[in-house]
A protein has these predicted regions:
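Rhodanese-like catalytic fold shared by cysteine-dependent sulfurtransferases
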Residues: 1-17, 21-54, 61-101
Length: 101
């Protein structure tokens, strides 16, 4: 994976782990995503995924997830950011689900 992925390419992706790192998420999220603290991911020496696992991070607009994904790539993880974040996903008209569903 390169450093980022478009909303459309993510929607078509298989076998990728999607992580929501928004600090103040609304009640909706990208289907199949899981909520994690981005700052914890960036600082932790032990991560909840393997270095060869394909991971996409998303935040609200793409800024925080780009920075954190870059840090994790430098540490050897296969992590990219969703270009434009959750905002781009919604603007592309892609599905969202209520949290907890």
């Amino acid at each position: 994976m390169s450093g980022s992925i478009s909303a459309e390419d993510l929607a078509a992706s298989k076998d990728v782990r999607i992580i929501d790192i928004r600090k103040a998420p609304d009640e909706r999220h990208i289907p199949g995503s899981e909520k994690m603290n981005g700052d914890d991911l960036e600082r932790s020496s032990e991560l909840p995924f393997a270095s060869d696992e394909r991971v996409v991070l998303y935040c609200g607009s793409g800024n925080s997830c780009s920075r954190i994904a870059g840090t994790l790539r430098e540490r050897g993880f296969d992590v990219v950011a969703l270009e434009g974040g959750y905002k781009a996903w919604k603007e592309a008209g892609l599905p969202t689900v209520l949290r907890g569903i």
